[in-house]
Amino acid sequence: MCNNSDRERSSQNSSNFKKNLPDDFHAVIFTGGLFAPPQNTKKYWAETGQPDFIAAADSGLEICDLYCEFYKNEYDFFPDIITGDFDSLNSSALIEKYKIKPDVFPCDKDFTDTELAVAFVYKEAQKHGVKNPHITLVGGDGGRTDHLLNIYDSFAAEKHVSVWLAKEQGLYLLKDGFNCDIFELGIEDIVSVARTSASRTKGALRSEGLVWEANCFRKDGMPSLSNRISQEFYNLSKPVKLCAKGADFLVIVPLSAVVIMSKFEC
């Protein structure tokens, strides 16, 4: 079983540690539902490095356990906190395995297990002097549509995740005033862009390297659905570029893509 001393070694040995994160505190939340298989997330952790904090929400502990085992020689995904109402965890033996007293909430509550984990991460980040942590959410895909919509809506909340690794796609929050470069796209890979629930019409995007560039994007609702890298950019191995101004957006790409965020003037 992995442990926190492994985490320290992983952090020290990761040459890419935090180099591509805009914030100084990286937390991972595992939550129940369909999730990105650990073997399909290797590129993501290679870019972001060893996380600072791990939270498991309800049956997300089962996913956390899978990641802990799969990456035991590379990264430490040992949970720092286990929280939720535990109405979907298949076996309480998993809690005993990690020897952490769970933070248990009643089933009838005002927040989802994922929201509780996000709130806890923000409190933990504040202890480290970080106001806005970088949070990666693993899981939460499929199943109940209301939970899916809640996760989508949470990107517009004051306390939000930064990246959502769903079963087959990664959703990246592209904040106002930020650029993103999307590397390692296949010629048939789908690139989509959505607005957060904060607005249907605000903001504008600039793009480079898409088949249908930003001048073709819809002015309201979802700007671009099922777009692709242009043949020229693919042949030259150039990254697709997107820049957000005036609003936040969600960039949706395959798990195999590598997304790098940076803050520059659009």
Please tell me what each predicted stretch does.
Residues C2-E96:
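N-terminal beta-strand-loop-alpha-helix module at the start
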Residues I29-T31, D58, V138-G140, L165-A166, ...:
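Short beta-strand segments
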Residues P37-Q39, I63, F111-A117, R144-L149:
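Short glycine/serine/threonine-rich phosphate/pyrophosphate-binding segments
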Residues G49-F53, I100, A156-W164:
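Structural alpha-beta junctions
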Residues L61-I63, S88-S91, F111, R144, ...:
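Short gly/pro/ser/thr-enriched loop/turn and capping motifs at secondary-structure boundaries
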Residues I95-H128:
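Short phosphate-binding loop-to-helix
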Residues N132-I182:
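Anionic-ligand-binding alpha/beta catalytic cores of soluble enzymes and soluble regulatory domains
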Residues L174-C266:
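Long, charged alpha-helical interface segments
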